[in-house]
């Protein structure tokens, strides 16, 4: 296979999983999640969170988990439930959580989150301070989740298709391809991508300084002795990135993010940051600046970078407005404001983790200790 084939993880031999045949079949998707992503074993408890719009996938997940002699625990949210919570919640409901919520996570062996929104702008009218308070309060739940086998994925809905400017059928086919479920052997496909990314990590692991250059961007940061993670579909499905946590006080320069972001259903675009000794000292956005400023004020860690990631999935070629896909686009780099992933060696703690994307496909460059890693969206 060519380097591009490896980057897309495309296989050339058949396998044993049920194929989607170009259409997104819930049974094939569920088998991939229960088998490859979570590696569910007999006797384990799998906590699955989603909305009722993911019913076809949830029913097949129940089957796939039971077939592995494990216990499925489905937590299904109703349309409007999250907005209704923020509208009616009193202070204690924003600043605390029930003990059972943490107990479930601690007792689960694996945790699967499935995005399936009915309205991507459901929270657009909610005071961002209420959202931030709730996020801060639930930090122990997030930290407990990170210690488990966990995976985040997506089930296509009409709202997500509209956000991506696609028809429902087009978006479902797009998702199927991004998951490699249109391939004869999806697991082998993800293995091919993992191998490509492992070679990329081999080039990055000994690097001390990364430099990101593009129009409006010239940023340096240190990744010395930090651990690079090969995101091969086990934590995110789809995936296609390698990432690490930069040294918290090392980022210097400016960066312009060129892909629209939609956190909590709020459009944010044209974000520009100035960083000095790791901290954001100036920030602006052409759209959604009020949200940007509130996000940076979430807590002490929100003004520092928790992640740098390099997208490698050339099967995802266009932004969709959904970060699960967009941060994986081959030829892009993303930086996260806020929380680090502990496995990278990153030490930044925050209730915020907001990925922002810089597209390098039209004149950008990423170097490691002066060596070109990626230029104009191509790996070298």
Regions found by a protein language model. Name each.
Residues 2-252, 376:
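Active-site bordering "gate/hinge" segments
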Residues 215-216, 225, 275-277, 368-371:
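Short acidic-glycine loop/turn motifs at beta-strand connectors
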Residues 249, 264-267, 274-275, 299-303, ...:
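A structural signal for short secondary-structure junctions
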């Amino acid at each position: 296979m060519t380097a591009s084939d490896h980057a897309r993880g495309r296989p050339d031999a058949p396998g044993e999983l049920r194929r989607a045949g170009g259409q997104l079949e819930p049974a094939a998707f569920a088998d991939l999640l229960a088998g490859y992503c979570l590696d569910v074993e007999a006797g384990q408890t799998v906590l699955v969170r989603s909305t009722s719009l993911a019913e076809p996938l949830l029913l097949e997940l129940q089957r796939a988990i039971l077939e592995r002699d494990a216990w499925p625990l489905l937590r299904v949210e109703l349309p409007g439930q999250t907005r209704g919570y923020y509208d009616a919640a009193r202070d204690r409901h924003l600043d605390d959580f029930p003990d059972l919520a943490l107990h479930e996570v601690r007792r689960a062996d694996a945790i699967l989150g499935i995005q399936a929104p009915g309205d991507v702008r459901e929270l657009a009218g909610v005071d961002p301070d209420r959202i931030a308070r709730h996020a801060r309060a639930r930090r122990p739940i997030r930290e407990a989740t990170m210690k488990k086998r966990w995976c985040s994925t997506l089930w296509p809905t009409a709202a997500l298709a509209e956000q991506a400017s696609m028809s429902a059928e087009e978006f479902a086919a797009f998702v199927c391809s991004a998951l490699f479920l249109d391939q004869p052997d999806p697991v082998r496909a993800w293995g091919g991508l993992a191998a490509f990314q492992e070679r990329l990590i081999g080039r990055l692991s000994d690097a001390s300084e990364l430099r990101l250059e593009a129009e409006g961007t010239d940023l340096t940061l240190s990744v010395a002795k930090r651990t690079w993670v090969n995101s091969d579909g086990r934590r995110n499905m789809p995936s296609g990135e390698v990432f690490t946590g930069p040294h918290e006080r090392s980022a210097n320069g400016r960066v312009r993010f060129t892909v629209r972001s939609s956190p909590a259903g709020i459009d944010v675009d044209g974000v520009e940051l100035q960083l000095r000794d790791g901290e954001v000292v100036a920030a602006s956005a052409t759209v959604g600046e009020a949200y940007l400023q509130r996000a940076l004020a979430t807590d002490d860690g929100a003004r520092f970078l928790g992640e740098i990631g390099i997208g490698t999935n050339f099967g995802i070629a266009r932004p969709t407005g959904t970060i699960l896909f967009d941060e994986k686009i081959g030829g892009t780099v993303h930086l996260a404001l806020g929380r680090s992933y502990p496995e990278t060696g990153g030490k930044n703690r925050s209730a915020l983790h907001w990925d922002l994307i810089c597209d390098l496909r039209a004149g950008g460059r990423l170097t490691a200790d002066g060596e070109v890693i990626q230029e104009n969206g191509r790996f070298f």
